[in-house]
Amino acid sequence: MCEARSSFYNRAKQIELLSLQASSPPTSPGLAVIAADMQEVDAVIARRLASGVPLVGQVSHYIIGAGGKRLRPALLLLTCGALGYQGSQRFNMAAVVEFIHTATLLHDDVVDGSALRRGSATANETFGNPASVLVGDFLYSRAFQMMVDAKDMRIMEVLADATNVIAEGEVLQLMNMHDATLDSAGYLHVIRSKTAKLFEASARAGAILAGASPSLEQACADY
């Protein structure tokens, strides 16, 4: 038993080290303008993944380092840039939306029983379902810690609402899984909740950081 556990943790540590050594997600030409900002976000992510519980760091680094385009953080940064906000809080909030997104992926893969994501073994396949669920919970709670640090109730309201809507979307998808009567309106409602809501919240949070008017904030969210 002890030998098997030691082998598991050694393997997990190797995975964590490989993830930390991996380069940041490739930047498309359209996102080159925020390449330096994205490096700052990656630094915040690495710093705020710190935990005194080794398995938390191992699973977190594994899923964060597995690739992805960081589109939600990019949207927040681009909104801030378009509205003239250059404060450092944009890096923290960009990391927050990435943590929320990553938590949904961890939970999603457990619910779906997925073995692969982006061509690699999922976290639940590598570490097991219990670890994936609990580390997803850690990422949610860390995201909310960071929101509290920002001391902006409006941003907390927007991102808390988005997190709630995403969870409802996941439950709706589960309920509709074998429903042959589901129409396009019902399907669109699910994907608006599961996917579009966090994009909307990312743009809205960027506008709030920039001190945009309510009408401009809404325009960014609608976009």
Feature-to-residue mapping (PLM):
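Mg2+-dependent prenyl diphosphate-binding active-site environment of isoprenoid biosynthetic enzymes
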Residues: 25-26, 33-35, 39-40, 46-223
